[in-house]
Amino acid sequence: MFHPIEEALEALKKGEVIIVVDDEDRENEGDFVALAEHATPEVVNFMATHGRGLICTPLSEDIAGRLDLHPMVDHNTDSHETAFTVSIDHRLTKTGISAQERSFTIQALLNEESVSDDFQRPGHIFPLIAKKGGVLKRAGHTEAAVDLAKACGSQGAGVICEIMNEDGTMARVPELAEIAERHQLKMITIKDLIEYRYNITTLVNREVDITLPTDFGTFRVYGYTNEVDGKEHLAFVMGDVPFNSEPVLVRVHSECLTGDVFASHRCDCGPQLHAALAQIAEEGRGVLLYLRQEGRGIGLINKLKAYRLQEQGYDTVEANEALGFLPDLRNYGIGAQILRDLGVQHMKLLTNNPRKIAGLEGYGLSISERVPLQMEASEHNKQYLQTKMKKLGHLLHF
């Protein structure tokens, strides 16, 4: 049903329209997407006729800044923070609404000689400003269009249009698949685009490395920063870097302040952290990644709010969902990049979570063995662990 990102890029370079599908837990919709440079009157008319949604022009911050395209509102209350600017028409257009005139306005946005005064406001083209960092910062169609344009070697600008059914309802994946087949279009997901970007773009910088004696032995600690969100991550390493081709014992541990530092009994994070360090030290060779993904990615304060809901009878999954989050928001692309930087090619992964295995293998790393890391349950965390086993698929035994 979905095509590889590489095939979609080739189609875009040829001037074709593709379909980009959002995550089912976000807007769960599909947009027609084309490169702005290929937004001919025929492409605009195709989107208007078969998409029926609003035709918008996602732009990089640089292009929007050069043309003084300011936000439509001072206080954006849209649930997805879609960054509309004031709508525009080129001053040489008449009504600005025809496919020919909308195409003309879009092409003028790409002209490096265009200036702000070349456009009148409001108009019939709706520019959108993509966030710096693209889909790795915000998983929206705006960012997807700009990321795809840049991946094609084009300017950071695209054209998008939401796809609606003939009855006016939003087209979902089954209908989108029919539309793609009918018009012979490539169809991709933003999720796959995120994975593609993690694989082709180096987003971590090794900032420092030091020797750290611990209760478990002496480790070499490497500090990394993420270019997209500025978060800082650590790698505790025992053994020589870069590693050779032999499988390395690896633990990917997400930050848990309450468990790691304050010995909370609500989870098993602290004991898992210590057990992993001990096992790596015993083996004499390995890596523990400490990723800043507190609360399975929802952050410390939201994790505490989830705890409060658990006190009212929710389990850990239900609490996340009640707060508007997925059960697990963690992404392992940054971790995979750190492991690659350390020369890890093959690993034995310390985990009870099969999704973590799939997450790392999705970024081209080889996992030869899963090494269980089950801690003894307590009266305080037994239900939590049972929920992870039943609802999140963790491989635990009681």
Swiss-Prot record:
The keyword Chloroplast does not apply. The active site is at D328 (proton acceptor), R330 (nucleophile). Its EC number is 4.1.99.12, 3.5.4.25. The keyword GTP-binding applies. Mg(2+) 1 binds at E27. One of its GO terms (biological process) is riboflavin biosynthetic process. Residues 200-398 are annotated as: GTP cyclohydrolase II. This is Riboflavin biosynthesis protein RibBA. D-ribulose 5-phosphate binds at R26, E27, D31, R138, A139, G140, H141, T142, E162. GO terms for molecular function: 3,4-dihydroxy-2-butanone-4-phosphate synthase activity; GTP binding; GTP cyclohydrolase II activity; magnesium ion binding; manganese ion binding; zinc ion binding. The lineage of its organism: Bacteria, Bacillati, Bacillota, Bacilli, Bacillales. It comes from the Bacteria. In the N-terminal section; belongs to the DHBP synthase family. In the C-terminal section; belongs to the GTP cyclohydrolase II family. Zn(2+) binds at C256, C267, C269. InterPro entries: DHBP_synth_RibB-like_a/b_dom, DHBP_synthase_RibB, GTP_cyclohydro_II, RibA, RibA-like_sf, Riboflavin_synth_RibBA. Pathway: Cofactor biosynthesis; riboflavin biosynthesis; 2-hydroxy-3-oxobutyl phosphate from D-ribulose 5-phosphate: step 1/1; Cofactor biosynthesis; riboflavin biosynthesis; 5-amino-6-(D-ribitylamino)uracil from GTP: step 1/4. It comes from Bacillus velezensis (strain DSM 23117 / BGSC 10A6 / LMG 26770 / FZB42) (Bacillus amyloliquefaciens subsp. plantarum). GTP binds at R251, V252, H253, S254, E255, Q272, E294, G295, R296, T316, T351, K356. It catalyses: D-ribulose 5-phosphate = (2S)-2-hydroxy-3-oxobutyl phosphate + formate + H(+); GTP + 4 H2O = 2,5-diamino-6-hydroxy-4-(5-phosphoribosylamino)-pyrimidine + formate + 2 phosphate + 3 H(+). Its cofactor is Mg(2+); Mn(2+); Zn(2+). The record marks H124, E162 as: Essential for DHBP synthase activity. GO terms for cellular component: cytosol. Keywords: GTP-binding, Hydrolase, Lyase, Magnesium, Manganese, Metal-binding, Multifunctional enzyme, Nucleotide-binding, Riboflavin biosynthesis, Zinc. The gene is ribBA. Catalyzes the conversion of D-ribulose 5-phosphate to formate and 3,4-dihydroxy-2-butanone 4-phosphate. Residues 1-199 are annotated as: DHBP synthase. Binds 2 divalent metal cations per subunit. Magnesium or manganese. Mg(2+) 2 binds at E27, H141.
